[in-house]
Amino acid sequence: MDSKYQCVKLNDGHFMPVLGFGTYAPAEVPKSKALEATKLAIEAGFRHIDSAHLYNNEEQVGLAIRSKIADGSVKREDIFYTSKLWCNSHRPELVRPALERSLKNLQLDYVDLYLIHFPVSVKPGEEVIPKDENGKILFDTVDLCATWEAVEKCKDAGLAKSIGVSNFNRRQLEMILNKPGLKYKPVCNQVECHPYFNQRKLLDFCKSKDIVLVAYSALGSHREEPWVDPNSPVLLEDPVLCALAKKHKRTPALIALRYQLQRGVVVLAKSYNEQRIRQNVQVFEFQLTSEEMKAIDGLNRNVRYLTLDIFAGPPNYPFSDEY
């Protein structure tokens, strides 16, 4: 297999490419950009494409995948596509219809991976963040173990090859793993992870349970207000990363991506810029020494860019625990 498509074996026997293309973009970015960027990513060598119902771009991303299949660039089985169940569909009876809606938007028969996007539940309906007349979020109370059972049924039905979670803390992972009658373990936990927030404890826990950690915001470049504090430090301007980039004749982004691969983390690189999309697949062309890895480990300062504190309050809010 070409180094560009290096994969990790998941606990269910399926394989996931270790470098993924993240398709999220702020609301003001035209959706047509998701179509163009996803096509460029596949042309550049990305085979793992990450999206979600929340991103409101699955129609465009699906079209990009299907157009690259139609022109002979790739086969469907070459592409590893991830979608995610949003918080307004946690009730067990809403899980399969939510996935079927994503598949209809994508015009695909199955997804390779379906994740519970975030562990806090909100009231069902069309609104992704439903609020009352005072602007308060309308939360829902759902047993995530029941949600997980409904996700397992999607795997049994062949609608998702693999299933996992995102933004879960250790306690929430243990709740699923210790569930009586568990049929399938989550294959992965997709979380924010980068040199300023390296998730060492959660990574060690996931490895001990044969769960892959997938890193989003791996470049810390998602600085969209009001989600991210504009005063938070800019990761890609870090002097250590910049010095290593200079030494290896690479970009600071590539250093941050390579760091994750060498510690056994699957990494998502999100960019709509053609040059950077092409650059990011160079992550397989060089290696960091153990000293360089240690230096990057030393940058950790527990800076979580995406606190999602609008969801704080309910007991399932994941980021109050240490990890």
Swiss-Prot record:
Q: Where is this site: Important for substrate specificity?
A: L54
Which GO terms are recorded in the biological process aspect for this UniProt protein?
Answer: bile acid and bile salt transport; bile acid metabolic process; cellular response to jasmonic acid stimulus; cholesterol homeostasis; daunorubicin metabolic process; digestion; doxorubicin metabolic process; epithelial cell differentiation
Q: Where is this site: Lowers pKa of active site Tyr?
A: K84
Q: Where does NADP(+) bind?
A: 20-24, 50, 166-167, 190, 216-222, 270-280
- Protein keywords: Cytoplasm, Lipid metabolism, NADP, Oxidoreductase
GO CC annotations on file? cytosol; extracellular exosome
Q: In which tissues is it expressed?
A: Expressed in all tissues tested including liver, prostate, testis, adrenal gland, brain, uterus, mammary gland and keratinocytes. Highest levels found in liver, mammary gland and brain.
Catalytic activity, EC: 1.1.1.-, 1.1.1.112, 1.1.1.209, 1.1.1.210
Known regulation of its activity is:
Inhibited by hexestrol with an IC(50) of 9.5 uM, 1,10-phenanthroline with an IC(50) of 55 uM, 1,7-phenanthroline with an IC(50) of 72 uM, flufenamic acid with an IC(50) of 6.0 uM, indomethacin with an IC(50) of 140 uM, ibuprofen with an IC(50) of 950 uM, lithocholic acid with an IC(50) of 25 uM, ursodeoxycholic acid with an IC(50) of 340 uM and chenodeoxycholic acid with an IC(50) of 570 uM. The oxidation reaction is inhibited by low micromolar concentrations of NADPH.
What is the protein named? Aldo-keto reductase family 1 member C1
Q: How does it assemble?
A: Monomer.
Question: What's this chain's function?
Answer: Cytosolic aldo-keto reductase that catalyzes the NADH and NADPH-dependent reduction of ketosteroids to hydroxysteroids. Most probably acts as a reductase in vivo since the oxidase activity measured in vitro is inhibited by physiological concentrations of NADPH. Displays a broad positional specificity acting on positions 3, 17 and 20 of steroids and regulates the metabolism of hormones like estrogens and androgens. May also reduce conjugated steroids such as 5alpha-dihydrotestosterone sulfate. Displays affinity for bile acids.
Which SUPFAM superfamilies does the record match to this protein?
NAD(P)-linked oxidoreductase
GN (gene name): AKR1C1
